[in-house]
């Protein structure tokens, strides 16, 4: 948590070959220059090993943000809209052909391992806006993962309370920024679909997928509001950390009122995740049959289940604080049911049968810990494993307490699930404001371009990114005859 998105890549494109601007002649050239920087940064990010991509993420975000004002300026000129009170006259000379590599579409999956998925061609600047903004939103989500990563690392000492709150606040801000972008794109895509009947080229930028990603970002941001003051995951991680030097632990303490509030927040996150899952699951039944990958659908379902399990845990904490240990254990049974954990009927707890079952569980935990240490696709189960560890700790504590002191009857969990209240929202989604060029920059682009646009000279495929230069002493046009067969020969 959050979802480990993969950033797309794109082909080279020259704005000057498809657009001309009478009012600001240098606008197409500047847009091509900014887009070329974005293309190179995305290509460099993709080729960097996964464990080292974090260092290049701020560069990708900054290049995307720098490119957006020029892209929106060209888009405004095509639709005859003013920017800062200044008219921009952009003329379409020929339909653009831009290639993007989708990362969420199920048809992007390839049968050959190690081969990149196929690209899709877009013939409208509108979908260029969609891909660039969705890429920026995905990058914001990856920045949220980067901020939360130190909270789950076990190879160093646990972070303090203040550092934990700072990390959660930074991640929440990035997720809310991503949700605002997704909401803007979803509204714009719905207008294209209903008003002009335009079908998206892939599922990544379809109205349903964009709305689902907005709901996903809101669900993850809502869960972070709970994680900020939830002491139990930190206690479980601290107990598993071998580098922890604390010899005295403070028992987790949650006020009764806040436990009920946290439960309703988790239910709100579960509702967002359920909406996202429903939208993505319905894509395959829509016209065209475009659908998202199974891994993304599985993550949405796990997030919905984990959020409901968290709500059951907080309802159980609320009951335990009120002296109703039997009801608290019943809430744990309901949460285990939501997590899909098998229960032993004789003991009522999570099934801990020895042999291969326990060995497989330990192997899964070690594999997830290695993913966290290396910074790979950790949290791909939407926090299900982490929540099951908290459940195990609470089950041992409450069952021992009920067997020795309280001796209360554990009621069935079915009626408790039917009495769960509605979720409560905590975040307000702010509308996304498209960035605009400032007046001095617009005024400077009234001058004619000082150079030609060389974006078309670069190959369109990011696999063949090495240009064949002229060999010294060779005749013009015979560069390929002197080319070595080694791909990366220097």
UniProtKB/Swiss-Prot annotation:
Disulfide bonds: none
Renumbered residue ranges of the record's region Disordered: 342-362, 445-470
Entries under InterPro entries matching the protein: BRO1_dom (IPR004328), BRO1_sf (IPR038499), pH-resp_palC (IPR037505)
A single Gene Ontology CC term: plasma membrane
Ranges for domain BRO1: 1-299
Source taxon at top rank: Eukaryota
CDD domains named in the record: BRO1_UmRIM23-like (cd09245)
GO terms (BP aspect): cellular response to pH
PANTHER family: PH-RESPONSE REGULATOR PROTEIN PALC
Family classification: Belongs to the palC family.
Task of the protein: Required for the proteolytic cleavage of the transcription factor pacc-1 in response to alkaline ambient pH.
Protein name: pH-response regulator protein palC
Organism of derivation: Neurospora crassa (strain ATCC 24698 / 74-OR23-1A / CBS 708.71 / DSM 1257 / FGSC 987)
Gene assigned in the entry: palc-1
């Amino acid at each position: 948590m959050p979802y480990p998105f993969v950033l797309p890549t794109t082909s080279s494109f020259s704005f000057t070959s498809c657009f001309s601007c009478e009012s600001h002649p240098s606008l197409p050239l500047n847009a091509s220059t900014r887009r070329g920087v974005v293309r190179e940064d995305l290509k460099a990010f993709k080729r960097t090993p996964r464990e080292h991509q974090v260092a290049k993420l701020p560069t990708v975000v900054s290049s995307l943000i720098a490119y957006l004002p020029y892209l929106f300026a060209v888009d405004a000129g095509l639709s005859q809209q003013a920017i800062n009170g200044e008219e921009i006259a952009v003329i379409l000379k020929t339909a653009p052909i831009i290639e993007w590599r989708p990362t969420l579409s199920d048809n992007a999956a390839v049968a050959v391992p190690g081969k990149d998925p196929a690209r899709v061609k877009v013939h409208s600047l509108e979908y260029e806006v969609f891909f660039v903004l969705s890429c920026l939103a995905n990058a914001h989500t990856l920045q949220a993962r980067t901020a939360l990563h130190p909270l789950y690392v076990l190879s160093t000492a646990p972070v303090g309370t203040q550092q934990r709150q700072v990390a959660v606040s930074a991640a929440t801000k990035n997720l809310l920024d991503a949700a605002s972008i997704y909401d803007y794109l979803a509204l714009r895509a719905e207008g294209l679909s209903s008003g002009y009947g335009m079908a998206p080229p892939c599922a990544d930028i379809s109205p349903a997928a964009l709305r689902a990603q907005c709901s996903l970002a809101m669900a993850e941001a809502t869960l972070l509001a709970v994680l900020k003051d939830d002491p139990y995951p930190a206690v479980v991680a601290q107990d598993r950390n071998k580098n922890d030097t604390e010899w005295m632990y403070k028992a987790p303490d949650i006020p009764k009122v806040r436990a009920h509030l946290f439960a309703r927040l988790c239910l709100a996150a579960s509702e967002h995740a359920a909406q996202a899952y429903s939208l993505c699951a319905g894509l395959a039944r829509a016209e065209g049959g475009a659908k998202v990958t199974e891994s993304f659908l599985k993550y949405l379902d796990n997030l919905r289940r984990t959020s409901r399990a968290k709500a059951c845990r907080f309802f159980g904490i609320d009951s335990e604080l009120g002296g109703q240990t039997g009801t608290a254990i019943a809430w744990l049974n309901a949460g285990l049911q939501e997590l899909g954990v098998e229960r032993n009927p004789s003991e009522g707890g999570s099934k801990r049968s020895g042999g291969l079952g326990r060995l497989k569980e330990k192997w899964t935990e070690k594999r997830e810990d290695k993913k966290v240490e290396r910074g790979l696709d950790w949290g791909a189960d939407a926090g299900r494993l982490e929540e099951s560890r908290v459940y195990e700790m609470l089950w041992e504590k409450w069952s021992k307490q009920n067997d020795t002191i309280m001796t209360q009857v554990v009621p069935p969990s079915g009626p408790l699930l039917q009495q769960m209240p509605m979720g409560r929202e905590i975040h307000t989604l702010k509308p996304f404001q498209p960035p605009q060029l400032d007046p001095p920059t617009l005024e400077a682009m009234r001058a004619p371009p000082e150079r030609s646009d060389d974006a078309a000279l670069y190959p369109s495929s990011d696999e063949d990114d090495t240009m064949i230069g002229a060999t010294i002493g060779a005749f013009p046009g015979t560069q390929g005859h002197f080319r070595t067969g080694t791909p990366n020969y220097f």
